[in-house]
């Protein structure tokens, strides 16, 4: 498998519902590095890097709604080239 990085924006009821923390848990379980952070517009930004198949699993998890308390309306993602090395999956 090749290594890839993506950046995704998740829209809906995704702040104040544990979205970043459960995303971190799922990403670490899949062996990914990157981060999840809240944006001012109420969305969450996720950068995930790792094996292509594992990154795709995280994207599918995000699209399926994330944690039970969240309500995901839309997920946009694209390839990403982070400026620095990501050694863990963090919450920002």
Swiss-Prot record:
Q: Which Pfam families match?
A: Acylphosphatase
* Keyword Transferase included in the entry's annotation: no
User: Record's InterPro entries?
Assistant: Acylphosphatase, Acylphosphatase-like_dom, Acylphosphatase-like_dom_sf, Acylphosphatase_bac, Acylphosphatase_CS
Q: Name one GO molecular function term.
A: acylphosphatase activity
Q: What is its EC number?
A: 3.6.1.7
Q: Which reaction does it catalyse?
A: an acyl phosphate + H2O = a carboxylate + phosphate + H(+)
- Which ranges carry the Acylphosphatase-like domain? 5-92
Sorted UniProt keywords = Disulfide bond, Hydrolase
The residues responsible for catalysis, as annotated, are: 20, 38
HAMAP family, per this entry? Acylphosphatase_entero
Family listed: Belongs to the acylphosphatase family.
Q: What is this protein called?
A: Acylphosphatase
Per the UniProt record, the source organism is Escherichia coli O1:K1 / APEC
Taxonomic lineage of the native organism: Bacteria, Pseudomonadati, Pseudomonadota, Gammaproteobacteria, Enterobacterales
